[in-house]
Amino acid sequence: AQTCGDTSAGFKPFIAEMKQEAAAQGVSKRSIAVLDTVKYDAAIIKRDRGQSIFSDSFLTFQKKMISNYRLQHGKDLVQKHKATFDRIQKQYGVPAPVIVAFWALETDFGATTGDFNTIQALATLAWDCRRPEKFRPQLIASLQLLDIGDLTLEEVRGFWAGEIQKAFEI
């Protein structure tokens, strides 16, 4: 098992590096200052490394995660918000069923939310050597969301893997 990221050793210099990277990408000093509040969270690393669902076969995963309710409710939401999904597909190229599938799997259509500080979670995951290329950009993006006003610091709550649970109006 990998041991990188198992301790906070080196986390503060890493945060200093991320602050420089955020500044280079145009993030405001106000949003960058949020990084001064984050701490290494060993519980995040433990959860990340303990995801047993990724060792399941597809059939086992399907039985656990796909239900008639999710399929029908997903179809209903695609119809209900058709104009919004059409606009998203036109602008970003992502079809409605893909978005709705993630919505279902990640939050059961918003029914479940987390209460983790997602910036702290993303910083911890970005520090871990296993997938920094995934989490460093997400950490910067979360600071950018603060900058443009799509989120407030109080709203940057969600699941341990950094998913932000803001209920957006669609």
Feature map (PLM): residue ranges:
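Mature N-terminal segment immediately following signal peptide/propeptide cleavage
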Residues: T7-A33
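Catalytic glycan-binding domains that act on GlcNAc-containing polysaccharides
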Residues: V27-I170
